[in-house]
Amino acid sequence: MAVSRTSVHILPILGPPAILRQGMRTYPLHWVLGVGVLLVFGLYAQRLGFLPAWAAWGLWAGYLLLALWGLLWGGWRAVPLALGLLAPLFPPLAFLGPLGTALVLGRTLPEKAQAAFYGWALVWPALALLLVWQVFPTLYAFYLSLFDRVNFLRPAAFAGLQNYRILLEDPLFWRALGNTFWYVVFTVPTGLLLATFVAILLNTQVAFLGLYRTLFFLPYITALTAAAAVWRWIYHPEFGFLNWLLHTPGLDWLNTPTGVFALLLRPLGVELQGFLAGPSLAFVAVMAMSVWHFLGYQVVILLAGLQAIPKEYYEAAELDGASFFQKHRLITWPLLSPTTFFLFTLGLIGAFQVFTQVYVLTPTGGVLQDTLTLAFYLYNKGFRDSDFSYASAIAMVTFLVILVLTLVQRRLLEKRVNYEI
């Protein structure tokens, strides 16, 4: 039985003490940022030799205790608040501060410490961007998922893992997960096989190779929103090019919720229902547009991999009497495995985050939510319903699914990758 969002009770075993929970309802983000920035600058001061290790950690621990005191008993709130007002200055300081310090003070360090110091100084800009735009949003999304209906307009109550329990009982979440699964299964292998076939054809002694390569790559550099808008007209039931080409006037590609397996087997008297019916015709239309859009990128990458294979291998295979298919099965596919593994990994990760083409082609998620994906459902919960806590829970589950599947496919497929030519 689904759990209503309005009937949720906070579980005491999952929540902090009452006094801390009451304070966390108005817990400002700049307190978290302030503690983190103080920790970073304290560690840098310790690495530069300005502070001993115990002093740097002591200052950070003291500030943390001070912030908790202000959180629980209301005192000294001006200290973290003042630090929070300086938050806009933290990104440029974090980016330029270490580099400037390295130029000014780096040569004063001992010779052995200079190499490590300059290494950290050069790595820090990229590391700072990674922490600010990747690591921190991920951690903050998990933090938001522990509250009840965060919308940044009113205080939110701490809910522990309640959002995740509701998520597991949400039929729309499972519908979105199933649709996303179909999208991954159809688009990733199909796109990779088509791209490999086209790349092999272009790798032969064909005239105007540069022109063909440009033509295949043009869809990828076209804005995805614009491309999806064009395809929406291609799928139009009355004026669409596809219906004219197939002589199927009136077929509404983007509003047909019937599964393609059910449509194909219905003339044979076989009726399929539910998940066995397959993805809807509308979702297959979305997937076809996606394969077309990303095909050029995969073709260019695969063509570069094919051109790196020595021609002597094919010449030796011809002398041994190998056929066209034997050459590509025994030479091309094994030596192209690093490239295909790379594209398969990127395709798997990207397919689980599909949003733009689904939103443009089917803005409502389909007639029966048959084109609803995880990213689309996350968007609806966060920006349409203003429930950022539940949207954050969806984001964290999506992140875990992508992480697990990526690790599994890496473990299964990397053993078959041949990095030696």
Functional labels for PLM-detected ranges:
Residues 1-4, 320:
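Intrinsic disorder/low-complexity segments
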Residues 3-144, 178, 182, 193-229, ...:
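N-terminal signal-anchor/first transmembrane alpha helix
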Residues 115-421:
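A structural signal for multi-pass alpha-helical bundles of membrane permease subunits
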